[in-house]
């Protein structure tokens, strides 16, 4: 559970990857990315998560460094989830998510 002022958010560990702690952390903050909604304050959520994680698990910078890659993977997984479930009615989000994944890949220097 993440707590922000008077709001609680639940981490859905069903989406967590076995043994990939960076993916677990990416899932926890993915819905705070700017393209998912307005006013999500990703930087604040990300920094708070990292600070808390490093406090509990010091010397895990190698895990922290994987989070941007896992954020990209999560975005691509959501695209696939939407494509597989047209009855859910989220197709209109696909172009936004594709653009976001391209931007994430560029930030990771995977694309020019």
Residue ranges and their predicted role:
Residues 1-6, 49-52, 56, 104-111:
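Short charge-dense sequence patches
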Residues 1-23:
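Active-site acidic catalytic loop and adjacent metal/ATP-binding pocket
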Residues 10, 14, 37-38, 64:
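Residue-level detector of alpha-helix boundaries and kinks
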Residues 14-15, 31-34, 49, 100-103:
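Short, surface-exposed linear patches
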Residues 20, 41-51, 63, 96-105:
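Generic hydrophobic, helix-prone segments enriched in Leu/Val/Ile
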Residues 22-58, 72-89:
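Active-site activation/catalytic loop segments of kinase-like enzymes and analogous catalytic loops
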Residues 40, 77-112:
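ATP/Mg2+ or Mg2+-diphosphate-binding catalytic cores
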Residues 59-71:
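All-alpha amphipathic helical-bundle segments outside canonical DNA-binding/catalytic cores
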């Amino acid at each position: 559970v993440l707590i922000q002022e008077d709001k609680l958010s639940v981490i859905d560990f069903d989406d967590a990857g076995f043994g990939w702690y960076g993916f677990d952390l990416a899932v926890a903050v993915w819905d705070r990315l700017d393209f998912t909604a307005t006013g999500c304050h990703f930087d604040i959520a990300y920094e708070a998560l990292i600070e808390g994680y490093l406090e509990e698990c010091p010397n895990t910078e190698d895990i922290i460094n994987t989070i941007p890659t896992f954020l990209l993977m999560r975005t691509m997984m959501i695209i696939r989830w939407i494509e597989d479930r047209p009855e859910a009615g989220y197709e209109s989000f696909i172009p936004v998510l594709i653009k976001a994944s391209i931007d994430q890949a560029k930030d990771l220097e995977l694309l020019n």
